[in-house]
């Protein structure tokens, strides 16, 4: 695995990455997950995104650097995880995934876990 790109900020550490990927996997099972940079952009534009997860080892990284700008406009937290392969596995697909979006659902069973991870991501951005 190549070293993460320095443009990938904020980068989650190993424990936070694992928590994020666990929530991504649960959200995928609950149909609360959108996979890919294009779908993540759509959720941001529609205002239904809780937070955005991006892969730091994406090559070239510029194909998803529009997302942090959009996140800051929409006031949505975002984070980079080290591996696109791990993000793809957590999303439940056999291919690498460079970006994912957890969507809003007030009746969700994993709402508390989503908010806990969201708070940790927000502290990274400060």
Swiss-Prot record:
GO process annotations (BP): mRNA processing; RNA splicing; rRNA processing
GO cellular component, one term: spliceosomal complex
GO molecular function: RNA binding
Protein location: Nucleus, Nucleolus
Top-rank lineage group of the source organism: Eukaryota
InterPro entries in the cross-refs: eL8/uL1-like, H/ACA_rnp_Nhp2-like, Ribosomal_eL30-like_sf, Ribosomal_eL8-like_CS, Ribosomal_eL8/eL30/eS12/Gad45, Ribosomal_eL8/Nhp2
Keyword tags: mRNA processing, mRNA splicing, Nucleus, Ribonucleoprotein, Ribosome biogenesis, RNA-binding, rRNA processing, Spliceosome
Primary location class: nucleus
Similarity comment text for this entry: Belongs to the eukaryotic ribosomal protein eL8 family.
Subunit structure: Component of the U3 snoRNP particle. Binds to the C'/D and B/C motifs in U3 snoRNA. Component of the 25S U4/U6.U5 tri-snRNP particle, a subcomplex of the spliceosome. Binds to the 5' stem-loop of U4 snRNA.
Function: Common component of the spliceosome and rRNA processing machinery. In association with the spliceosomal U4/U6.U5 tri-snRNP particle, required for splicing of pre-mRNA. In association with box C/D snoRNPs, required for processing of pre-ribosomal RNA (rRNA) and site-specific 2'-O-methylation of substrate RNAs. Essential for the accumulation and stability of U4 snRNA, U6 snRNA, and box C/D snoRNAs.
PANTHER family for this protein: RIBOSOMAL PROTEIN L7AE FAMILY MEMBER (PTHR23105)
Name of the protein described by the UniProt record: 13 kDa ribonucleoprotein-associated protein
Source organism of the structure: Kluyveromyces lactis (strain ATCC 8585 / CBS 2359 / DSM 70799 / NBRC 1267 / NRRL Y-1140 / WM37)
